[in-house]
Protein backbone atom coordinates (compact mmCIF):
# COMPACT_ATOMS: atom_id res chain seq x y z
CA UNK A 1 0.00 0.00 0.00
CA UNK A 2 1.33 3.43 -0.90
CA UNK A 3 2.45 5.65 1.97
CA UNK A 4 0.17 8.44 0.77
CA UNK A 5 -2.89 6.18 0.97
CA UNK A 6 -1.91 4.79 4.39
CA UNK A 7 -1.26 8.28 5.78
CA UNK A 8 -4.57 9.53 4.38
CA UNK A 9 -6.44 6.66 6.01
CA UNK A 10 -4.70 7.38 9.34
CA UNK A 11 -5.63 11.06 9.10
CA UNK A 12 -9.29 10.30 8.33
CA UNK A 13 -9.52 7.77 11.19
CA UNK A 14 -8.16 10.49 13.49
CA UNK A 15 -10.79 12.97 12.31
CA UNK A 16 -13.42 10.37 13.26
CA UNK A 17 -11.88 10.06 16.74
CA UNK A 18 -9.98 6.80 16.28
CA UNK A 19 -6.42 5.64 15.66
CA UNK A 20 -5.37 3.54 12.68
CA UNK A 21 -3.80 0.22 13.72
CA UNK A 22 -3.33 -1.17 10.22
CA UNK A 23 -4.73 -1.01 6.68
CA UNK A 24 -4.26 -3.36 3.77
CA UNK A 25 -5.62 -4.19 0.35
CA UNK A 26 -6.79 -7.81 0.11
CA UNK A 27 -7.73 -9.60 -3.09
CA UNK A 28 -10.07 -12.59 -2.90
CA UNK A 29 -10.80 -13.92 -6.35
CA UNK A 30 -11.83 -10.92 -8.43
CA UNK A 31 -12.97 -8.83 -5.45
CA UNK A 32 -10.70 -6.30 -3.74
CA UNK A 33 -11.22 -5.12 -0.18
CA UNK A 34 -9.62 -2.22 1.66
CA UNK A 35 -9.43 -3.53 5.23
CA UNK A 36 -8.98 -0.86 7.90
CA UNK A 37 -8.33 -1.75 11.55
CA UNK A 38 -8.89 0.93 14.18
CA UNK A 39 -8.76 1.43 17.92
CA UNK A 40 -10.22 4.10 20.15
CA UNK A 41 -7.54 4.42 22.82
CA UNK A 42 -5.72 2.11 25.19
CA UNK A 43 -8.65 1.84 27.61
CA UNK A 44 -11.75 2.10 25.39
CA UNK A 45 -13.00 -0.66 23.10
CA UNK A 46 -14.00 0.13 19.53
CA UNK A 47 -17.77 0.14 19.01
CA UNK A 48 -19.83 -0.43 15.89
CA UNK A 49 -20.56 3.31 15.97
CA UNK A 50 -16.80 4.03 15.83
CA UNK A 51 -16.44 1.72 12.82
CA UNK A 52 -19.39 3.41 11.11
CA UNK A 53 -17.97 6.90 11.79
CA UNK A 54 -14.57 5.96 10.35
CA UNK A 55 -16.24 4.26 7.38
CA UNK A 56 -18.27 7.40 6.60
CA UNK A 57 -15.23 9.67 6.96
CA UNK A 58 -13.07 7.40 4.81
CA UNK A 59 -15.76 7.01 2.14
CA UNK A 60 -16.01 10.79 1.73
CA UNK A 61 -12.23 11.16 1.52
CA UNK A 62 -11.80 8.22 -0.86
CA UNK A 63 -14.52 9.58 -3.17
CA UNK A 64 -12.86 13.02 -3.33
CA UNK A 65 -9.19 11.97 -3.47
CA UNK A 66 -9.75 8.78 -5.51
CA UNK A 67 -6.44 7.14 -4.47
CA UNK A 68 -7.64 3.64 -5.39
CA UNK A 69 -8.25 2.82 -9.03
CA UNK A 70 -10.98 0.30 -9.71
CA UNK A 71 -13.74 -1.20 -7.62
CA UNK A 72 -13.16 -2.17 -4.00
CA UNK A 73 -15.10 -2.87 -0.80
CA UNK A 74 -14.31 -0.86 2.35
CA UNK A 75 -14.18 -2.87 5.60
CA UNK A 76 -13.59 -1.14 8.95
CA UNK A 77 -13.20 -3.13 12.18
CA UNK A 78 -11.27 -3.49 15.41
CA UNK A 79 -7.93 -5.31 15.06
CA UNK A 80 -9.15 -8.23 17.18
CA UNK A 81 -7.42 -10.17 19.94
CA UNK A 82 -4.54 -11.11 17.63
CA UNK A 83 -3.91 -7.48 16.70
CA UNK A 84 -0.80 -6.62 14.72
CA UNK A 85 2.13 -4.93 16.44
CA UNK A 86 3.37 -2.18 14.15
CA UNK A 87 5.61 0.23 16.08
CA UNK A 88 7.78 0.47 19.20
CA UNK A 89 4.86 1.91 21.18
CA UNK A 90 2.82 -1.26 20.47
CA UNK A 91 5.63 -3.53 21.66
CA UNK A 92 6.01 -1.53 24.87
CA UNK A 93 2.26 -1.19 25.42
CA UNK A 94 1.72 -4.96 25.24
CA UNK A 95 4.69 -5.86 27.45
CA UNK A 96 3.90 -9.13 29.27
CA UNK A 97 1.70 -10.43 26.43
CA UNK A 98 2.42 -13.39 24.20
CA UNK A 99 3.46 -12.44 20.67
CA UNK A 100 4.48 -14.08 17.41
CA UNK A 101 7.19 -12.37 15.40
CA UNK A 102 8.12 -13.12 11.77
CA UNK A 103 11.54 -11.82 10.74
CA UNK A 104 12.74 -10.69 7.31
CA UNK A 105 15.78 -12.95 7.57
CA UNK A 106 17.12 -15.72 9.76
CA UNK A 107 18.29 -15.04 13.31
CA UNK A 108 20.13 -18.00 14.81
CA UNK A 109 18.40 -20.21 12.25
CA UNK A 110 14.93 -18.91 13.07
CA UNK A 111 12.56 -16.80 11.01
CA UNK A 112 9.54 -17.08 13.35
CA UNK A 113 9.54 -16.74 17.12
CA UNK A 114 6.85 -16.82 19.76
CA UNK A 115 7.17 -15.78 23.38
CA UNK A 116 6.52 -13.13 26.00
CA UNK A 117 7.12 -9.50 25.09
CA UNK A 118 9.50 -7.89 27.55
CA UNK A 119 9.07 -4.46 25.98
CA UNK A 120 11.54 -2.11 24.31
CA UNK A 121 15.13 -1.47 25.42
CA UNK A 122 17.45 0.91 23.55
CA UNK A 123 15.02 1.07 20.60
CA UNK A 124 15.06 -2.75 20.31
CA UNK A 125 12.15 -5.15 20.85
CA UNK A 126 12.82 -7.80 23.48
CA UNK A 127 11.09 -11.21 23.51
CA UNK A 128 11.62 -14.12 25.90
CA UNK A 129 10.77 -17.77 25.28
CA UNK A 130 12.00 -21.21 26.40
CA UNK A 131 15.05 -20.84 24.13
CA UNK A 132 16.18 -17.58 25.69
CA UNK A 133 15.99 -13.84 25.28
CA UNK A 134 15.78 -12.34 21.78
CA UNK A 135 16.37 -8.74 20.70
CA UNK A 136 15.33 -7.24 17.36
CA UNK A 137 15.31 -3.89 15.63
CA UNK A 138 11.88 -2.92 14.35
CA UNK A 139 13.25 -3.02 10.78
CA UNK A 140 14.17 -6.71 11.26
CA UNK A 141 10.51 -7.62 11.74
CA UNK A 142 8.37 -8.55 8.75
CA UNK A 143 5.19 -8.82 10.83
CA UNK A 144 4.22 -9.34 14.44
CA UNK A 145 0.97 -10.00 16.26
CA UNK A 146 -0.38 -10.74 19.69
CA UNK A 147 -1.19 -14.37 20.47
CA UNK A 148 -4.39 -14.58 22.56
CA UNK A 149 -4.16 -16.72 25.67
CA UNK A 150 -7.24 -18.76 26.54
UniProtKB/Swiss-Prot annotation:
Keyword DNA repair in the entry? The reply is no
Annotated PANTHER family: RIBOSOME MATURATION FACTOR RIMP
The UniProt function text for this chain reads: Required for maturation of 30S ribosomal subunits.
Q: Alphabetically list the UniProt keywords.
A: Cytoplasm, Ribosome biogenesis
Taken from the record, one Pfam family name reads: DUF150_C
* Name of the protein this chain belongs to: Ribosome maturation factor RimP
Q: Which gene encodes it?
A: rimP
Q: Where in the cell is it found?
A: Cytoplasm
Q: Which HAMAP family match?
A: RimP
Q: Read off the InterPro entries from this record.
A: Ribosome_maturation_RimP, RimP_C, RimP_C_sf, RimP_N, RimP_N_sf
- UniProt similarity note: Belongs to the RimP family.
Quick one: where is this thing mainly located? cytoplasm
- Which first-to-last residue range defines the signal peptide? none
* GO terms under cellular component: cytosol
- What GO terms in the biological process aspect are recorded for it? ribosomal small subunit assembly; translation
Where do the TM regions start and end? none
* Record keyword Cytoplasm present: yes
Amino acid sequence: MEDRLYEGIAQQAGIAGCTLVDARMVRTGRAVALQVFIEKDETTAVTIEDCAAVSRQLSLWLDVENPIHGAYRLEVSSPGLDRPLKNLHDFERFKGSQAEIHLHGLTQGRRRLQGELLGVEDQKIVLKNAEGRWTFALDDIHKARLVPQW
